[in-house]
């Protein structure tokens, strides 16, 4: 067997660049997760999955590593505190978690608990999120910021929540909202805590660049800010404004765009302070990105800066502008949800099968027994036997021409089905032989660089792309994917990953590779009776809540895990994935009614002796078991 090391696997999957020192490969060749960056403690993911299956927790399984979540919260706050100290910044930093990034109750509760020492807050953007935020903050005084569109009921709820002791700030997104706020504040006699969202001319970069700029969906233009100040003065509520908010989009890939936005926001803050608006907080919104592909570039799946650089620029730019303007520096708020939760969850699942030709007939034997192969088949066979490095280009082009010719002749009725099957088999053999030669040639001829797509095998995995990783399908987001095991062995298959939905879009064909974006995922040949698992990493932000019920595949099993020095890990919580009856209920089917309808029909079939009692009973038993079972595939 060809020598291969775990270091070579780490390089192939670019692990060291996207893993943020939270993932590594152990001596067994299994990928591990660490509770914090550079920690020596680790959990072997393959061993963990084996243990979970023994506990009857079936894949796909969403693994939530709560120590990683805690570490990310601590890390972001630490780098900001360091930046404050280095720049002698006279105010404080505070992080607010936008719960839209991952609204799962257990996740938000954990963030609230871990973040208490940092005075973490919650950002909400709708009435349901407001109610969730109030529930989480009850008893612990967590501050809440309300963004998004608001109606009278929303505003009144916030006002009375403020009246009974909750620390909630309403951010004004539009002037008509401010009119409602002023009206309800006067009606209830409750003075609100207010923020104003400004529409910066600065834009971000990447997929969400339109969140900033003059055409942004939210925020007040400069003329509208002046109008808002006048409205608040006339209502005697100007002193209620204590926050200025801006946001140029999620996953900002370029640090220079962030700097430009910070300067503009700080200038607006300074001018508003000079106008007598006693703003205490400058909320710079989200945008702190995640390096999904490890390229450290301005590509939309990466960022060209570190968290440390981001924090230093935030503190420096704001302090510089405020000192220049002669105004007090504000307390700084950021809403860095993606950077907080992306790393803490991993989806693991099993590979079910591949589209390899292992089950194909022995065409070599068939060819030997054929008296006179079809001319097209004969030409392909001759190429296969004679190909070498000196005839690669010509043979490759001839092969493409001949396989197209075989299809045309078949459609015209001049080739049999067996002839076409043999032609396809020979085409595959020729491409593999070319590949074995090309791998030894440097540089690879340009016209041969993309031919490897013909070698790409499809690995079918037990998951729904639309449910678990919707951004991969919707916006072509890259997420790191790699096997959990056999990483001490050379991967010998170039693969794509297909899910189990009945949709051709349910396939991943772009991957994080050694040299950037790749059309292949290196995988190992499947062994008989071996369970082969893959992991989807950095999926903690947005994926769970954006997932849909395509083909009625529901939520996966989820497990909350913490590290334990004695036992390696502890399972804190197991959240069962959706059963079939639950996903059917979403679309207005009821399990008991289904069973009754089918049973009534079966009884009629039994009565006329078309179906036996035993067959009827067994079918109902199977149907009932399916309704109660996991929506994903078993053995």
Curated annotation (Swiss-Prot):
Its EC number is 4.1.1.19. It comes from Trichlorobacter lovleyi (strain ATCC BAA-1151 / DSM 17278 / SZ). This is Biosynthetic arginine decarboxylase. One of its GO terms (molecular function) is metal ion binding. Belongs to the Orn/Lys/Arg decarboxylase class-II family. SpeA subfamily. Substrate binds at residues 282-292. GO terms for biological process: arginine catabolic process; putrescine biosynthetic process from arginine; spermidine biosynthetic process. It is an enzyme of class 4 (lyase). Catalyzes the biosynthesis of agmatine from arginine. Keywords: Decarboxylase, Lyase, Magnesium, Metal-binding, Polyamine biosynthesis, Pyridoxal phosphate, Spermidine biosynthesis.
